[in-house]
């Protein structure tokens, strides 16, 4: 699992049927509480993350399972928003 910060949205008007209803977000990876120069695109189907929020991202086969459609062509899914204490 990765920690990151949502830095942007990606709009896709044409996409595979399995991806309809998914929100695409650009996430900047955080390592050791420091923003890195690494970015990924992750889908958000359930947590409604927004720009500026820190999120938890799962990748690989776990990401496909998290979408509810194990055959979806998804590599990264936002599974949680990090609460600030």
Report residues per predicted region:
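Structural detector for short beta-strands of small beta-barrel domains
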Residues: 1-14, 81-82
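C-terminal structural segments of small proteins and small subunits
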Residues: 48, 55-85
